Amino acid sequence: MTVKECYEKMGANYENVLSRLGGSEALVKRLVLKFLDDASYQKLEEQLLNKNVEEAFRAAHTLKGVCLNLGFDNLFTVSSDLTEKLRAKELDGADELFEKVKEQYEITVAALKNLD
């Protein structure tokens, strides 16, 4: 699967990120593959299980920023919603929002693992 096809599969904004990175598909590919090593999702999941709202907020905020920079609109939107919930130091409803993050994260990772 090409990088563009990968972005289409996950519902992300390939053209925007390609433009921001000077039109280099090789650079986009190199950066998005690094996402697979990013630990912010795992940290978010762990901190939510521990009911640590401050650390969960930091992890959600980091994930949101990475997704914004990589043009992963699908994952950015849901991680942004969770970030705002946690910014208010609220865990009430965070589990439901995390399930949306988890769904989009899994879609994103599955697409990235199919890159040529």
Model regions and ranges:
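Two-component system phosphorelay core
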Residues: 1-58, 62-116
